Amino acid sequence: MSDQNFSRLPKPHTTYANIIKSFLPIGDQEKSANAVLPNATYSVNTLEIDHDNLADYRRICGFENNSYVPPTYFAVLSQSLQMNMMVKEPFPFTMLGLIHVQNSVTQYRRIKDSAIFKMAVSFANLRDHDRGKQFDFVTKVFEKDELVWEGTSTYLSRQKRQKTTQKSSTTQVEAKPTLDSNDMHEFWEIPEDIGRRYAFISGDFNLIHLHPLSAKAFGFPKAIAHGMWTKAKCLGALGDLPESFTCDVTFKLPIFLPSEVEFIAKFDNRDEQVDFGVYDATTPKANLIGKITQAQAK
């Protein structure tokens, strides 16, 4: 097992040179088809919150400026370890082909931003998918010896498929729900520069988020919003979240910048569940589908 321990969270820019190299399609398709994830865990023994960065994060995502860590913030911090793992371990896929398809975070209690934490990130759950291979990054955050937060980010590595007569399964299309009187409903105007602004706060400088020209180089007609910014924006809009909960989201169609979108949240008091989504303002198409449920026991 390849474990690496850091005394402090590594800065994202330290991996950029290797990330650029990883964009090159080294290896053949057969190697990716027979991929094996490294058995690796990267951890930070002393994780202290940068309060200036946290204030910027709260502001751009719409979280209340209080003394607690927003539920998506550790997912952002974990990306530095994830990038290090992909460039330093024998990672079987090119980073260029990765698509962030799902994200789950669980907060076991409200977490003070003045505490000192330990964070550990591992590869997990490589499996087949209709369009290639999926795998997870699993992140756990401890305060002293108590597990206070954990998250799973699921990525898809698209692979070329052999020709077959069998029809592939159809992708489920999420339609915009009908509004009820007790639903939360907002229109958001998302500016063209949100990707650049969020990149400087999160450290995620993926070129598809920064500018139309760089996005076009990767097949997108315009720059697209970060999925984790969109998720955080939803949770910030919901406001008073439970002390302990799980929030699962699936990323659907990209949000091209600039855009107008609709945010809709439906509340089910019987199950203590919230179902929410972000939708194109002019069509029924979904950009993100999510739900908030009670956190299961650790």
Language model region names:
Residues 1-26, 33-37, 98, 104-190, ...:
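HotDog/MaoC-like acyl-thioester-processing domains
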Residues 1-102, 168-170, 174-242:
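Hot-dog-fold acyl-thioester-processing enzymes
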Residues 237-267:
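A conserved acidic, glycine/proline-rich C-terminal tail/linker
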